[in-house]
């Protein structure tokens, strides 16, 4: 079997990217690591996020990966440049693909972005969007309650609706916004509720599909696409509660996909300072 693609996230959110990678690249073998024990990354300092991200990368490098997908917006905002400079394998984040998808979607240049405190305060989405289209109008909103709620497995129902409605209240009077970027890979797990609260006139963008498409392009450019016809066996690791991780994974993946997975607990703590 060919080498695997490594995927990292602060928790279960990156599984939404993995799901799309499995759909678009069915021959590729994936190794996923979710740092659920230290989730969320959003309120943490840049230094902490950088340390935790490099610890995850270090773990995956021992698995001899051929490419890295940073399926965490906060980690992408704070560490992508360093990762690209220091690793000798292709690296992709989720912010640029999400920005490109939003530019394709908007008809009036009014784009909203929701994400963690870290992602929104970094201005990474505004910079990415404005680099593509200088006259874009970007409104950012941090939604701190979303990630902890998703990590508890609350993905729909009255609690999810109440939390999402309250968090998105600042956007309720913005009648011009026609596109909303889910600037955290946890948020697609709440997409139906977010769409309901925002209304059908707003296009809700998840970067997962675009990230998978750009991953495919990078594999092709670097000539590392898996050509084997063997059925891939994906490896998932979590630093946190294994049972909760498995239950959330079951809501994302079909039974046929689930039979192609092994899910284990990982200890990635290290004394090394990155």
Curated annotation (Swiss-Prot):
NCBIfam families: glut_race, PRK00865.1-3. One of its GO terms (biological process) is peptidoglycan biosynthetic process. It comes from the Bacteria. It is an enzyme of class 5 (isomerase). Provides the (R)-glutamate required for cell wall biosynthesis. This is Glutamate racemase. Belongs to the aspartate/glutamate racemases family. It catalyses: L-glutamate = D-glutamate. Keywords: Cell shape, Cell wall biogenesis/degradation, Isomerase, Peptidoglycan synthesis. GO terms for molecular function: glutamate racemase activity. The active site is at residues 72, 184. Pathway: Cell wall biogenesis; peptidoglycan biosynthesis. Substrate binds at residues 9-10, 41-42, 73-74, 185-186. It comes from Oceanobacillus iheyensis (strain DSM 14371 / CIP 107618 / JCM 11309 / KCTC 3954 / HTE831). Its EC number is 5.1.1.3. The gene is murI. The keyword Kinase does not apply.
């Amino acid at each position: 079997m060919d080498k695997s693609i490594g995927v990292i996230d602060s928790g279960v959110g990156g599984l939404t990217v993995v799901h799309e990678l499995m759909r678009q690249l069915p021959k590729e073998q994936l190794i996923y690591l979710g740092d659920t024990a230290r989730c969320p990354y959003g309120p943490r300092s840049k230094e902490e996020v950088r340390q935790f991200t490099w610890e995850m990368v270090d773990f995956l490098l021992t698995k001899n990966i051929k490419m890295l997908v940073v399926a965490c917006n906060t980690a992408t905002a704070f560490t992508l440049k360093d990762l690209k400079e220091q690793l000798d394998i292709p690296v992709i984040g989720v912010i640029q693909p999400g920005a490109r998808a939003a530019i394709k979607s908007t008809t009036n240049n009014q784009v909203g972005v929701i994400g963690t405190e870290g992602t929104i305060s970094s201005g990474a989405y505004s910079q990415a969007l404005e680099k593509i289209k200088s006259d874009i109008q970007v409104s950012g909103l941090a939604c701190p309650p979303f990630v902890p709620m998703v990590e508890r497995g609350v993905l729909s129902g009255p609690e999810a609706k109440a939390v999402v409605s309250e968090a998105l209240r600042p956007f309720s009077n913005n009648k011009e916004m026609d596109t909303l970027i889910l600037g955290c890979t946890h948020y697609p797990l709440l997409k139906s509720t977010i769409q309901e609260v925002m209304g059908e006139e707003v296009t809700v963008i998840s970067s997962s599909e675009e990230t998978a498409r750009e991953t495919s392009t990078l594999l092709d450019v670097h000539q590392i696409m898996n050509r084997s016809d063997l059925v891939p066996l994906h490896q998932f690791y979590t630093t946190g509660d294994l049972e909760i991780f498995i239950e959330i994974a079951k809501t994302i993946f079909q039974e046929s996909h689930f039979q192609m997975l092994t899910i284990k607990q990982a200890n990635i703590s290290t004394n090394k300072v990155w």
